[in-house]
Amino acid sequence: YKNLMEHGRVNTKSGHGNPGLSSTTVRSVHLMLHSAFERAVKERLISRNPTDDCIAPKVQKVEMKTLRPEHLKSYLDAADARGVLPMFYLELVSGLRKGELVALLWDDLDIQNRTISVSKQYIKNPSGKLTLSRPKTETSVRKVSVPQEAVDLLIQEHEKHPDSPYMFPSSTTGEMYYPDSVVKLHEKILRD
């Protein structure tokens, strides 16, 4: 399994710096193979399961990096300087995923009730094209309450581009942001 973890990625141009597969993926492959070979043993197609001698890697827990409260103001100031404060403020107070954030339309905002309807997300399909889909799980389709300050920022943002259906159109193209662009912007803001 070491080779899979170091060199197992088929498409190394997908933006991952590591050409290998994660321990979670390798473990999933092991479990799938083990189950298939176990079935073959039960059906007497093979005499023993070749994966019995293999040790699947332990799943490595990745520590989430979070923004510390004392850095919040400087983060928001940097987002404001880049002209993207409403988007990143909403992300902070709502916990929306990047694909959900860029898929938001003005119709998703209920100003009176201070809620945002989350019912879609943009994701990259295997060929690299963006596609609109429902969120990961049915419980991910939801209404998110947001503070009045977020609503006020969103209204100000809408006044800048009232003809756009997108809540956060790109200042360059006028179209929606790509989810990866949001990540890159976030990284730039952290460096500012």
How does the language model describe each region?
Residues Y1-P19, A36-E38, K42, R191:
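Basic/aromatic-enriched alpha-helical hairpins
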Residues S117, K143-S145:
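Generic structural detector for well-ordered beta-strands
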